[in-house]
């Protein structure tokens, strides 16, 4: 059996022969990471990516200085979508080791689920995986209902049914109730709503291959909020939280929805479809209507919703939108505490009015006259949140997935956002 490569930490610079910018050096005892006190977690993550790139698949984190955050930074960079990697973790106290183990279980579940091929992960499989994860951490406190196919139409979940009807795999709504109180009448503290588009071709507004090749990841919002709830439970969440996952394929067929169709929602809103590739907001609307009906203190929806958010922030930050400044500040505080990247983008009352339609109350996409696509998408969603000015956060999760490797991440899912939402839920 191959001996594990030892990885140690040092606050001293590397030997001059390695250059003045060296972040790691190799010696007879293994590899030393040279911390400079400026961005130590980022340095560790980038070094781990390089170590993986060397083909080293077994490592042992040894010596002084390792804690949960540094171990996790190493794993975030070391983990990749192909092959098996083995890490021997340093000695940590019980609380730190439990926190690390929970991250390894839950956030790796999120990354692996998002990376799964669409052929293996359809709407029903995504919903069932979410149930299985949450039952693994709190089954006694979990109840759920799965509604699919024509039952969605009969129950007037018209956005989800319309988007998903073009696929042979029926659309699915997962409504899950985490209620640790044991009281069926306990108030709902928070609702989490996730976009679960298990493959997005764009529909008749079809994507080019260069934009479609990563669309197995269009369910990243659903996976992330599921992981966030599970992770919050491991951190002691004792409040009632409901989860709504809106799962569907967006495909082309003789039964697929078309431009010019009008969707009539249960809250009385009528929406004209002028871009079938703006489908995420159409399915989220159904989940947000259900979430609002619970009258929670907090609603968080999460979705890989717009290319505009990626244009603004790249894949480096999740985009945050809210009318509630206090709540937005709380989430950004949680993000800072968890070392996760979020950035607030504008959402104003006028964005709600930048989706005009000649035939319905709303258009599902903005026109050239209103180019702020991420903000108008958030404005669209606000029409389905009963009290949209208070207690609602929309996250356009542009940092969920990377099509190609970069210096700190392998290609694929990142798992970013799980810890921040869990932190907010348990604050």
UniProtKB/Swiss-Prot annotation:
This is Peptidase B. It comes from Salmonella typhimurium (strain LT2 / SGSC1412 / ATCC 700720). The keyword Protease applies. Mn(2+) 2 binds at residues 195, 200, 218, 279. GO terms for molecular function: manganese ion binding; metalloaminopeptidase activity; peptidase activity. It is an enzyme of class 3 (hydrolase). GO terms for cellular component: cytoplasm. It is found in: Cytoplasm.
